[in-house]
């Protein structure tokens, strides 16, 4: 496999794993918040505020994964080295 194909696969798998993890984390957070509100409806405002802050923290992981994947795809610092290496091997 050439370098660009490996970069695309790495970015795809990285985003898939990151999205899977954040989806599971957000689902568990919402489940716990709903259970907490059903047990104590009087504390729903405090629970929902804490849940929203937690969801923002969890979602930031997906944003960081997206940024790293975009760097791998479009601003890879090793791209020039890999292309030169491939050219010398091809000769």
Swiss-Prot record:
CC per GO annotation: plasma membrane; proton-transporting ATP synthase complex; proton-transporting two-sector ATPase complex, proton-transporting domain
The keyword Transmembrane helix is assigned to this record: yes
CDD domains on file: ATP-synt_Fo_c (cd18121)
Residue ranges crossing the lipid bilayer per the database entry: 4-24, 53-73
Major subcellular location class: membrane
Annotated GO MF terms: lipid binding; proton-transporting ATP synthase activity, rotational mechanism
Keyword set, alphabetical order: ATP synthesis, Cell inner membrane, Cell membrane, CF(0), Hydrogen ion transport, Ion transport, Lipid-binding, Membrane, Transmembrane, Transmembrane helix, Transport
Residues of the site described as Reversibly protonated during proton transport: 59
Mode of membrane association: Multi-pass membrane protein
Pfam family, one: ATP-synt_C
Subcellular location: Cell inner membrane
Complex and partners: F-type ATPases have 2 components, F(1) - the catalytic core - and F(0) - the membrane proton channel. F(1) has five subunits: alpha(3), beta(3), gamma(1), delta(1), epsilon(1). F(0) has three main subunits: a(1), b(2) and c(10-14). The alpha and beta chains form an alternating ring which encloses part of the gamma chain. F(1) is attached to F(0) by a central stalk formed by the gamma and epsilon chains, while a peripheral stalk is formed by the delta and b chains.
Family: Belongs to the ATPase C chain family.
Function: F(1)F(0) ATP synthase produces ATP from ADP in the presence of a proton or sodium gradient. F-type ATPases consist of two structural domains, F(1) containing the extramembraneous catalytic core and F(0) containing the membrane proton channel, linked together by a central stalk and a peripheral stalk. During catalysis, ATP synthesis in the catalytic domain of F(1) is coupled via a rotary mechanism of the central stalk subunits to proton translocation. Key component of the F(0) channel; it plays a direct role in translocation across the membrane. A homomeric c-ring of between 10-14 subunits forms the central stalk rotor element with the F(1) delta and epsilon subunits.
Descriptive protein name: ATP synthase subunit c
Organism for this UniProt entry: Geobacter metallireducens (strain ATCC 53774 / DSM 7210 / GS-15)
The organism's taxonomic lineage, starting at the top: Bacteria, Pseudomonadati, Thermodesulfobacteriota, Desulfuromonadia, Geobacterales
